[in-house]
Amino acid sequence: MDIQASLFVPPLLGEVFWEMERFFKLKEHGTNVRTEIMAGLTTFMTMAYILAVNPLILTPTGLDWTAVFLATALAAGIFTIAMGLFVNFPVALAPGMGLNAYFASVIVASMATDTPISPAMGLTAVFISGIIFIILTVTQVRQMLITAVPDSLKHAITVGIGLFIAIIGLKNSGLMTIAVSSFNDIQAFNFTPVTGNETVIQLGSFSNETVLFTVIALFLIAILMVMRVPGAILFGILGTTVIALLTGHVDAKTALSGQTWAPDFTKLNFFHFDFAGVFEVGLITVILTFTFVELFDTFGTLVGTANRAGYMKNPEEGKKRVGKAMFVDAVGVSGGAVLGTSTVTAFVESSAGIAQGGRTGLTAVTTGVCFLLAIFLSPLVALVPPAATAAALIIVGVLMMQSVKEIDFSDMVYAIPSFFTLALMPFTYNIANGISFGIVSYVVLATVANVSGKGNKYKVHWLMWVLAVLIIYRYGFLGGH
């Protein structure tokens, strides 16, 4: 058997490899078992940081660290394997950056108000958004929504989320400080006038150890990325953790206190929902934001990875595969909420595995198995200092900024809405605000340009009008917060 001979494996293992080749159609896609497994490991290394970062972001909401860690590993493992087995696609899924931050910010912000939102309500909102996404996928409405929003605005959403993530990293690290009022005061709308203040946002003090270790982590990750080391973010986090342990910044005994190598599945927030609370508090906007962002984020990631893997050479086959992948992704959103984590989405880091030659679902299955094995490594993740994960957030923001070059800033009809979108997300600490102002301003400017004849005939899809009216109603009559 050629597979067995080329890999020097025992007969039984050779038969297993042969079955893998047959099931995943490896020859048809010009790949082999070894290449796929190596690609899967590469993808895992590039996105394993989510195991440390997701618990860091979600625990301020009141969710238990261990529960979030287990939910993250399980959701990533289960739905990445599902992507590999049912779609034969080399794409991995995990709780997404940006939406996890939005999830946390909505809950934390509500703590200072008369209508606090519980983690159970937040998970319910994620679950409902997943159901909506499934319906949109099955009914093909998702295609209409995707074509309705101008490309520049789609890219601005990606950039805005990147800046939003970077702001969180800068804040958590202490590199960025706000010397006006506490977060709770601001979110309770007890605003301090700042028009007379020369500086609102300031650089943190380098006498703070966390700030210093964040800078170390940033340079370490950046150098590894410049050297094109696969898994640069993960290795940067690990390197910073080792330095923190050696210098005493992290005390291993304290960090490992109460940790166990055997996963405690009883801590999982399984089916931790509160449907009545969601509609009592009025989380419709939050649900729609989850759905809206997930829609474009997933579409962009899946089309981009499908293109890199060569599936779009046959447009019909490519569209069919992306459609199936979107369905698995949609199920993953609700499935992740059932397990107790924020929105699960396709990871753009999957392109790292594709660059290593991954072409089939075997790449995804390998990545998924790695995530399931990581369940037994929670004590090691507990050693990771906040500075390392904060640096990872900042670097993820850098990576998402790459989409800015796709925005047409030469045309004000696209430039102004795009700027509102990407600027308001980080500076109002709310993804929904950026999307809302972007959509409304585009509809207004495109309509004025069309009616006045001062510009090209800009396409304003009827769905954009519907969204604009709903947004104006929300901010005008329901309050903008």
Region locations from a protein language model:
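Helix-loop-helix hairpins and the membrane-proximal interhelical loops
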Residues: 16-68, 199-203, 235-323, 472, ...
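Membrane-embedded alpha-helical modules
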Residues: 115-239, 365-481
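N-terminal amphipathic/basic-hydrophobic helices that include classical n-h-c signal peptides
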Residues: 1-18
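Short helix-coil transition sites and intra-membrane helix breaks within transmembrane domains
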Residues: 45-49, 86-96, 133-136, 228-229, ...
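Transmembrane alpha-helix interface/packing and boundary motifs in multi-pass membrane proteins
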Residues: 79-91, 222-228, 289-297, 329-339, ...
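Helix-loop-helix junctions within the multi-pass membrane cores of secondary transporters/permeases
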Residues: 19-54, 75, 96-105, 109-161, ...
